[in-house]
Amino acid sequence: MQDIKTYLSTAPVLATFWFGLLAGLLIEINRFFPDALTFSFAF
């Protein structure tokens, strides 16, 4: 069990999880707000 915890806390595994989470978040944001690149943040 300790070996599994050590493996899951290594940088490639954490980076894969983080980038997957970030990609999913960006996909969902773009689904609800499709033209974010042309959206002005300076109201």
UniProtKB/Swiss-Prot annotation:
Membrane-traversing stretches: 7-27
A GO BP entry: photosynthesis
InterPro entries linked: PSI_PsaJ (IPR002615), PSI_PsaJ_sf (IPR036062)
Domain of life: Eukaryota
GO cellular component, one term: chloroplast thylakoid membrane
Main location: plastid
Key word Membrane present: yes
Annotated membrane topology: Single-pass membrane protein
Keywords annotated in UniProt: Chloroplast, Membrane, Photosynthesis, Photosystem I, Plastid, Thylakoid, Transmembrane, Transmembrane helix
Annotated compartments: Plastid, Chloroplast thylakoid membrane
Segments forming a coiled coil: none
Record keyword Transmembrane present: yes
Role summary: May help in the organization of the PsaE and PsaF subunits.
Family: Belongs to the PsaJ family.
HAMAP family: PSI_PsaJ
Name of the protein described by the UniProt record: Photosystem I reaction center subunit IX
